[in-house]
Amino acid sequence: MSMDIIKGNLDGISKPASSSRSRPGSRSSNGSLEVLSPEPGPVKIDMVNKLNSGKEGHTSDSRVEERRKISDDEWADNPRSTEPAQESSDEDSNLSQPQGTPEHSDDPKLEGTDAVLQNAIHKMHRLDKILAKRRIREKEIKKQGLEMRIKLWEELKSAKNTEDLENDEELENTKKFLYLTSKSAGTAAEPLHCKFEDDLFSVFHTQIPQETYENHTEKDFTCDVEKNGPLIKTEKQPFSNTEAIEPRSEHSQVFIIRNAEHSQDFIKRNIELAKSSRSPVVMVEGEKKRLDELLKGLEDTDSGLSSSEGDQCAWLVPGEGYTLAATESQQLAEIDIKLQELSVDSPAVFSLESQSNKGDMEHDSNEERNTEPTPGEKILRDNKEQRDRESRLRAIDGKLKEINEQVEECPVITPGKRNERITWRWLLAKILEPECKV
């Protein structure tokens, strides 16, 4: 910014005009004005002009113009009151004052802003130190809370094991608390709960660092709160409201690790369930063999049932299964003869005798062949043998009772070796008599 400094005699001039100025270097008489070249301003003014905005430059220009108008008005009112030298000195001082005022008016502003910034920086450092102390204190309190919860968990487990509780209500409440806590948060003695923020590690290589993690986990933390609400409640119980304001950065990674381990356990459990999906019932080796034998027998019976009625005895092993007694076979043969006599018109009559003869022939032809009986046939045969033994024992008991009654009715026999032999022979004959008849 340049400015022309006017110097000369102002006699006879009523009002100065901007067009009355002459070019630099021109000279005039006493009534003329002389325009001098502008003096170089100090370096500080240029620096201030660079730092100040365009608005400050505009205000400085307006101030200079206002002062020039005021000086012109004063000269118009009192044209002869001042001397040229005094006028020039006053004008120089008036013109130099607006150039010097920015230096004096702006430097205190800059110094004031610098002082404000320095105070703000010092205050920030002081608050950072206070915040660091508070965070350290919060970590210590949370560590103490975790230790107290672990101790409480151990005491409850020991009380549950030793049954030292006073009444049934306390025992029931303790069981419920242990069940809910173990279901939501797992065992408190796990090393996972003893880890703190300093011991945490990143799960993924793209994970945000721990310093800037708090600003990026608000949304993830809300999801973790919904999934692990009981765990957060148990974590917040030992702390006050002011201490529980910032649990995000410390517990969010714990939740991530817990969810990762839970997903791995879920995958392992699914693999184990898929392995045993085809065998819903756990069986021992002996039970499996027995089941295979029974299934084999069922397959044989199914194949036999699918055959025709004429081949009913073809799938039976000879000599096994239900066999008729001699008296029953004779009675059935007599019934068959009577049916044949009565039903002459019927073309097809079932002949049991022919089937029994056929079975006997097959049994004679296959005597040398040793076949393993099926489980069902073996059970039927064992049951038949047991029934036969029981019937024989009952018959023997009845005969013995009859013999005892007959012995009581017989006359007294003198003792002797010959009489004893006769008595025993007679008893044995009585016992074996019904078997011989059969």
From Swiss-Prot:
Biased composition (Low complexity): 18-32
UniProt key word Coiled coil: yes
Family: Belongs to the FSIP1 family.
Modified residues (Phosphoserine): 71, 88-89
Coiled coil residues, start to end: 131-157
UniProt region (Disordered), positions on chain: 1-111, 354-390
Gene Ontology annotations for the cellular component aspect, listed alphabetically: acrosomal vesicle; nucleus; sperm head
Protein source organism: Rattus norvegicus
Entry keywords, A to Z: Coiled coil, Phosphoprotein
Name listed for the protein in its UniProt record: Fibrous sheath-interacting protein 1
Record GO biological process: acrosome assembly; axoneme assembly; cilium assembly; homeostasis of number of cells within a tissue; mitochondrion organization; single fertilization; vacuole organization; vesicle budding from membrane
Origin: domain of life: Eukaryota
Composition bias, Basic and acidic residues: 53-72, 359-371, 378-390
InterPro entries in alphabetical order: Fsip1
